[in-house]
Curated annotation (Swiss-Prot):
Transmembrane segments: none annotated. The modification N6-acetyllysine is found at K157, K244. Keywords: Acetylation, Activator, Cytoplasm, LIM domain, Metal-binding, Nucleus, Repeat, Transcription, Transcription regulation, Zinc, Zinc-finger. It is found in: Nucleus; Cytoplasm. This is Four and a half LIM domains protein 3. Expressed in myogenic progenitor cells (at protein level). Expressed in skeletal striated muscle and the heart. Expressed to a lesser extent, in lung, and kidney. Expressed in skin and skeletal muscles such as the masseter, tongue, tibialis anterior and plantar muscles. Residues 40-92, 101-153, 162-212, 221-275 form the LIM zinc-binding domain. The modification N-acetylserine is found at S2.
């Protein structure tokens, strides 16, 4: 008598039948499938021993059931995305859920590098500076009326330009004759001393510090021969630095220098008598030589 060779579950003889050997013993094919096979998450049928089984996120599928839920394309050898537990091929996912690039109008594929700003989406290689047309990537940019500029292009296009060097002012600066200047560009035409924050004047639109303007253009005091910085014209006036002066005919004096050539009495606001290159008070003039 031959030794018994039965299925470990149904106890039916396996002689002459197909069976599957396991650690716990041999099983006929139906018992093996009922005992060990996984249930397909799509069709809810057992995945038999002779079926190709696919596994994704704790779920098991027949190869034929592993499909895009929209177009039914097999995903066995295709890239796919899971959205709300549903499997979608990349094409269907992009159509349903992906954004369109605001520049080229093409779909921004899942996993691709993209940039989002102001509710819009771009491929990384499509987000370009409106000036130089170079990719902005992670660089700083300035939005302007729907355009986007890298900082150098924005400054070159929109920033004010210095009246002296014509280069853009990116920060600070001063205003002279209603025009912007770099602080370092507003210097005395004579000695090149910076004039920002200092008192200065101009001649023929060129700025000068008080000292250079006096040396170059101001009339000289008839007494001390030093320059008088201020306005021109007869009578009394105020110099550029606030110092007062006196003019008579073609001669000029500092207030402190306008005095009688003999007795040194100040003649400011007093009557005086010219005597050649000198001026005398009335008393000294009447006293004679």
């Amino acid at each position: 008598m031959s030794e018994a060779f039965d299925c470990a579950k149904c106890n039916e003889s396996l002689y002459g039948r197909k069976y599957i050997q396991t650690d716990s013993g041999p099983y006929c094919v139906p018992c093996y499938d009922n005992t060990f096979a996984n249930t397909c998450a799509e069709c809810q049928q057992l995945i038999g021993h002779d079926s190709r089984e696919l596994f994704y996120e704790d779920r098991h599928f027949h190869e034929g059931c592993f499909r895009c839920c929209r177009c039914q394309r097999s995903l066995a050898d295709e890239p796919f995305t899971c959205q709300d537990s549903e499997l979608l091929c990349n094409e269907c996912y992009c159509t349903a859920f992906s954004s369109q690039c605001s520049a080229c109008g093409e779909t921004v594929m899942p996993g691709s590098r993209k940039l989002e700003y102001g509710g819009q989406t771009w491929h990384e290689h499509c987000f370009l500076c409106s000036g130089c047309e170079q990719p902005l990537g992670s660089r700083s940019f300035v939005p302007d009326k729907g355009a986007h500029y890298c900082v150098p292009c924005y400054e070159n296009k929109f920033a004010p330009r210095c009246a002296r060097c014509s280069k853009t002012l990116t920060q600070g600066g001063v205003t002279y004759r209603d025009q912007p200047w770099h602080r370092e560009c507003l210097v005395c035409t004579g000695c090149k001393t910076p004039l920002a924050g200092q008192q200065f004047t101009s001649r023929d639109d060129d700025p000068y510090c008080v000292a250079c303007f006096g040396e170059l253009f101001a009339p000289k005091c008839s007494s001390c021969k030093r320059p008088i910085t201020g306005g021109s014209g007869g009578g009394e006036g105020a110099g550029l630095g606030g110092g007062k002066y006196v003019s008579f005919e073609d001669r000029h004096w500092h207030h402190s220098c306008f005095s009688c050539a003999r007795c040194s009495t100040s003649l400011v606001g007093q009557g005086f008598v010219p005597d050649g290159d000198q001026v005398l008070c009335q008393g000294c003039s009447q006293a004679g030589p």
